[in-house]
UniProtKB/Swiss-Prot annotation:
Keyword set, alphabetical order: Amidation, Neuropeptide, Secreted
GO BP annotations listed: neuropeptide signaling pathway
Stated name of the protein: FMRFamide-like neuropeptide GGKYMRF-amide
Residue positions where Phenylalanine amide is found in the record: 7
Source species of the chain: Hirudo medicinalis
Main location as per UniProt: secreted
UniProt family annotation: Belongs to the FARP (FMRFamide related peptide) family.
Cellular component terms per the entry's GO annotation: extracellular region
Localization (cell): Secreted
């Protein structure tokens, strides 16, 4: 779900 998040 984000550039620095896995989802």
């Amino acid at each position: 779900g984000g550039k620095y998040m896995r989802f």
